[in-house]
A protein has these predicted regions:
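C-terminal catalytic/substrate-binding lobe primarily of soluble NAD(P)-dependent oxidoreductases
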Residues: 63-185
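Glycine-/Pro-rich loop/turn segments that contact NAD(P) or position catalytic residues
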Residues: 2-90
Length: 189
């Protein structure tokens, strides 16, 4: 449970002690929201592609093409394996945490949580063909739920190949995707 303060403190300390930067928490970015508003500036959460560009596209579409937007489905697809049996397209630790965490989506004014990888759908992408995609929680849906008036549903899906899923399952089976403390025996001095 990443909201558990004790767990978060232990995890943050471990990351800082080891020099890791994979710990992600956008609360420090959200804290600037009012300051940016007061200054008349636009800020984009995360500022990558998703989140980032997807939020800009959504806001642009609302401003220039639609009176209202009721549904946003973000489909994050890439077929890249970089020639390896297991590869991620960004920081592996963050990627594996996103995929192994509970999913969620916004519908009719509230959040619905799903089990990790519970929702699978297929979609035929013009350039790369039909892919399996899975509903995940992703931070831009939080910002879109707040900033797109009248939105009824927002979901985020990401595609994964079978080799990626097989390797992820192996990591999960040996406990490497756990986010809770694991004790194997009583501590002794």
């Amino acid at each position: 449970d990443t909201d558990d303060p004790q767990w978060r403190a232990i995890y943050e300390k471990r990351c800082k002690d080891e020099g890791f930067t994979a710990y992600f928490d956008y609360s420090w970015q959200w804290a600037y929201q009012e300051k940016f508003k007061e200054a008349g500036l636009t800020a984009i959460l995360g500022s990558g592609f998703d989140p980032g560009v997807t939020s800009v596209y959504s806001a642009y579409a609302l401003k220039h093409y639609f009176d209202e937007i009721h549904t946003i489905d973000i489909l994050d697809c890439n077929g890249g394996d970089h020639g390896y049996p297991f590869a991620t397209n960004f920081n592996p630790e963050i990627n594996l945490r996103e995929v192994s965490a509970n999913g969620s989506y916004w519908t009719d004014g509230h959040w619905v949580e799903t089990k990790p990888m519970e929702w699978r759908a297929q979609y035929n992408f013009d350039q790369v063909g039909e892919k399996d995609m899975y509903l995940l929680h992703h931070e831009e849906i939080e910002s879109l739920a707040k900033n797109i008036p009248g939105i009824k549903r927002i979901r985020f899906f990401m595609t994964f190949g079978q080799s990626y899923l097989t390797h992820m399952k192996c990591l999960e089976d040996v406990g490497m995707l756990r986010t809770c403390l694991l004790y194997t025996s009583d501590a002794a001095d």
